Amino acid sequence: MSTLFVSDVHLSEKNPKLTDLFFYFLKNKAILSRSLYILGDLFETWVGDDNITYISKELANITNYLADNGTSCYFIKGNRDFLIGKSYFKSSKITLLPYKKIININKQSIIILHGDTLCLNDKNYQKFKKLVNQDWLQKFFLKLPLCARIKISNLIINKRKKLNLKRMNYLTKINKEYIKKIMEQTNTNIMIHGHIHMPKVHVLPNRKYRIVLGMWNKSGSILEINKKLSLIKFSKLYCSYTSYPLKY
């Protein structure tokens, strides 16, 4: 059985076709796998576990079904859904992982993360991330009325879209020396991350790989690991594979 990885799905009530595609993937592809790792930004935004929507309810129903039928689901928080709380993970039978996690698959030592922490060139974002991850600020925000949290979230989303149009090239400049340092310190030979929306398998020296997951839109972006690495462009009608052999 294979292990699957996705990130940057950005589920939103405003994009029902995307939601339908992701749920189709869970029911028809993920159900056949051993494990599914979701590496952040599953949701376009998350303002609290009390904001119950069709998407959050149906996703929990599906992941419960997966867990009950042998597919384990794991989650690393991204920069859009870092406020998902314990109650939702419990109700959905999804296991929360730390921001960086080392796993082993087929004798491969792999480090997984969302990927925003690799964008060291974006100093303003790193300051923002440090601020919003403070426990006191998150508790304060979650105590606000739900309508206020939704309004604040929408303002942030609109501002983020404008900033990203101007700064996308700058934001996607991953610090390669930092990546090398992380992989050496953790003694891993594969790194998997999302965030920058540029799917690719980067072949590194010494039989190492850095795999970037893509963003979901009209099609899905999936990494599958079994006896090889495969980046999959997924839709209901077709799947295209770009595969690389695993080196032992």
UniProtKB/Swiss-Prot annotation:
It is found in: Cell inner membrane. It catalyses: UDP-2-N,3-O-bis[(3R)-3-hydroxytetradecanoyl]-alpha-D-glucosamine + H2O = 2-N,3-O-bis[(3R)-3-hydroxytetradecanoyl]-alpha-D-glucosaminyl 1-phosphate + UMP + 2 H(+). PANTHER family: UDP-2,3-DIACYLGLUCOSAMINE HYDROLASE (PTHR34990:SF1), UDP-2,3-DIACYLGLUCOSAMINE HYDROLASE-RELATED (PTHR34990). Binds 2 Mn(2+) ions per subunit in a binuclear metal center. One of its GO terms (cellular component) is extrinsic component of plasma membrane. InterPro entries: Calcineurin-like_PHP_ApaH (IPR004843), LpxH-like (IPR043461), Metallo-depent_PP-like (IPR029052), UDP-diacylglucosamine_Hdrlase (IPR010138). GO terms for biological process: lipid A biosynthetic process. Substrate binds at residues 79-80, 122, 164, 167, 195. The gene is lpxH. Its main location: membrane. Pathway: Glycolipid biosynthesis; lipid IV(A) biosynthesis; lipid IV(A) from (3R)-3-hydroxytetradecanoyl-[acyl-carrier-protein] and UDP-N-acetyl-alpha-D-glucosamine: step 4/6. Belongs to the LpxH family. Keywords: Cell inner membrane, Cell membrane, Hydrolase, Lipid A biosynthesis, Lipid biosynthesis, Lipid metabolism, Manganese, Membrane, Metal-binding. Mn(2+) 1 binds at residues 8, 10, 41, 197. The keyword Ligase does not apply. This is UDP-2,3-diacylglucosamine hydrolase. It is an enzyme of class 3 (hydrolase). It is a peripheral membrane protein. Mn(2+) 2 binds at residues 41, 79, 114, 195. GO terms for molecular function: manganese ion binding; UDP-2,3-diacylglucosamine hydrolase activity. Hydrolyzes the pyrophosphate bond of UDP-2,3-diacylglucosamine to yield 2,3-diacylglucosamine 1-phosphate (lipid X) and UMP by catalyzing the attack of water at the alpha-P atom. Involved in the biosynthesis of lipid A, a phosphorylated glycolipid that anchors the lipopolysaccharide to the outer membrane of the cell. Its cofactor is Mn(2+). Its EC number is 3.6.1.54.
